[in-house]
């Protein structure tokens, strides 16, 4: 592919001008660490009297194991249930009811073990079927429900949210992904001490109120957001096929059998391990004085003891994939062809070149909030031009790199045009990849891709909340310095780098392919997740991001589960 020198020069000049215009937006991040190991990131911006607050727990579904999948997301729910003094009318009775519920649940698990064995032997079809319950189990469930009813009469619902609202705060929320759990709120700058007290109280005095009944809430959430969505379980199965060994194998929301059986004791152990201050990062962006803000952090969060054992490492690594993996499914959703290639983590040295490659093939990245998606990218890139405009074989074609803490994927996908089938457009995708492998990219494509990534990077840093989210994403896969370094890493990418990573990672043996066709063989179907959108996962809001903070913003969001 050849392009005029004039177009190339124009693109380079535009890039340089844009970089100069944004030089004033470089972040001045003050990093401090409390004696208990909690990291604090402070960014002073005095354009409005507010502060975007958040604290990040470096824990997500990747830190789980079979038997407790979904626990990271369940804990996100638990952190909104109040503390020993917030959220209840009678703290002593509330704790006693928790103890009684634990005792009954232990007996319920014994009965469930009996049913599990019966199902294994074929004596019953489904241990979760109410018709399979033993009389003893029915009695225990009724006793447990009575305890839940009594506890709910003592609960002051959403008390923490009400306290925040009464003090002018907005946006109290949280989200869970594979690598992090993030708790956020926006406050008036005069209420920073209130925030420090409330959030440190959540960490210092948790009670895990309604733990068991909340499991049912999450099971229903799973049914609504995954199982009942067209193609939801197919995408879940495709993700599990793609990640064979690594904990990315399961969705953030977890397997239903694990959610239904996880215990408060397991939850308490999980909390003590992953919610200790030496595994947390607080992020404050806005109208603040760094020294005064740090003093408040020390006063309130400093009282929480560290976990001397630290966090166990995620040791399971994804093995080298020996051959192409394929899944063909008939589902009630728009047909598509998708190929996910094993790539690298967000902080890997090849991540920047893969980001550029994603923009060349798929178009400009989204500029919305990291981890939450954003405006759909405009149709552009080589795949759109070739498959949609020139060949008219597809109605949409996309590509993106998504790097996470422990691994990454480079994904290409397309929706066939009327009269076309996924199996017909699949080789058209590969043909465009092969062109990059064989011939590389042009200077103009490189310049435009870098400019697009730079625009996305700085656009995300225009607001306090955008800075907060970008810093959190960087901390979840590496450190905030990766965010600061991302523009120069992108700028250092050469045409040779892009061709090299295409040759290295876009190989048949490393890809997992999903072809979906409409049941009955029809070409049109119900809406599905857009190609190039959030990967198979729970809901946007986990699970994606950014492709990691290095380099610059990702072209695709990271699968997250919100609240």
Predicted feature descriptions by range:
Residues 1-13:
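Bacterial N-terminal signal peptides that target proteins for export
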Residues 23-63, 88-190, 212, 224-279, ...:
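Non-catalytic beta-strand/loop surface segments
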Residues 69-81:
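Active-site recognition of the HExxH zinc-binding catalytic motif
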Residues 201-208, 300-308, 391, 430-441:
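A common structural junction motif
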């Amino acid at each position: 592919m050849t392009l005029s020198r004039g177009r190339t020069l124009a693109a380079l000049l535009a890039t340089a001008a844009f970089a100069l215009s944004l030089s004033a937006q470089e972040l001045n991040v003050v990093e401090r660490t409390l004696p208990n190991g909690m990291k604090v990131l402070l960014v002073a911006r005095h354009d409005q009297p507010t502060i975007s607050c958040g604290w990040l727990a470096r824990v997500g579904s990747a830190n789980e194991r079979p038997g407790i999948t979904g626990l990271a997301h369940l804990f996100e729910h638990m952190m909104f249930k109040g503390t020993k003094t917030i959220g209840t009318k009678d703290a002593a009775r509330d704790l006693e009811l928790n103890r009684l519920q634990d005792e009954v649940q232990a007996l319920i698990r014994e009965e469930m073990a009996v049913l599990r064995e019966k199902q294994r032997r074929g004596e019953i079809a489904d241990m979760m079927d109410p018709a399979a319950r033993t009389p003893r189990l029915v009695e225990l469930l009724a006793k447990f429900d009575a305890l839940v009813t009594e506890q709910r009469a003592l609960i002051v619902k959403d008390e923490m949210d009400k306290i925040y609202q009464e003090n002018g705060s907005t946006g109290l929320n949280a989200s869970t992904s594979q690598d992090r759990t993030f708790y956020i709120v926006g406050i008036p700058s005069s209420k920073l001490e209130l925030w420090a007290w409330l959030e440190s109280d959540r960490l210092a005095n948790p009670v895990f109120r309604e733990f068991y009944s909340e499991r049912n809430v999450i099971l229903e959430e799973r049914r609504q957001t995954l199982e009942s969505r067209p193609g939801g379980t197919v995408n879940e199965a495709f993700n599990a096929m793609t990640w064979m060994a690594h904990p990315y194998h399961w969705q953030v929301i977890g397997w239903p059998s694990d959610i239904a059986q996880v215990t408060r004791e397991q939850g308490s152990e999980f909390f003590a391990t992953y919610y200790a201050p030496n595994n947390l990062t607080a992020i404050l962006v806005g109208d603040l004085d760094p020294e005064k803000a740090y003093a408040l952090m020390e006063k309130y969060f400093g009282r929480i003891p560290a976990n001397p054992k630290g966090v166990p490492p995620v040791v399971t690594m994804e093995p080298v994939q020996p051959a192409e993996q394929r899944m063909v499914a008939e589902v009630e959703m728009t047909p598509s062809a998708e190929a996910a290639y094993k790539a690298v983590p967000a902080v890997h040295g090849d991540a920047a070149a893969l980001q550029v490659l994603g923009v060349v093939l798929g178009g400009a990245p989204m500029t919305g909030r990291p981890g939450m998606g954003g405006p759909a990218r405009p149709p552009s890139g080589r795949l759109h031009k070739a498959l949609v405009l020139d060949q008219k074989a597809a109605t949409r074609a996309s590509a993106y790199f998504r790097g996470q803490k422990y691994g990454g994927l480079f994904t290409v996908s397309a929706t066939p045009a009327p009269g076309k089938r996924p199996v017909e457009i699949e080789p058209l995708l590969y043909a465009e990849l092969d062109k990059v492998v064989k011939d590389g990219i042009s200077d103009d494509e490189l310049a435009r891709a870098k400019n697009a990534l730079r625009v996305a990077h700085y656009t995300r840093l225009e607001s306090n909340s955008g800075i907060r989210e970008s810093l959190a994403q960087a901390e979840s896969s590496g450190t905030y310095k990766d965010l600061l370094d991302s523009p120069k890493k992108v700028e250092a990418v050469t045409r040779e780098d892009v061709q090299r990573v295409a040759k290295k990672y876009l190989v048949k043996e490393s890809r997992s392919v999903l072809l979906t066709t409409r049941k009955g063989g029809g070409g049109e179907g119900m809406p599905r997740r857009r190609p190039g959108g959030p990967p198979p996962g729970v809901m946007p809001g986990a699970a994606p991001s950014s492709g990691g903070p290095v380099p610059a913003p990702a072209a695709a969001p990271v699968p997250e589960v919100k609240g």
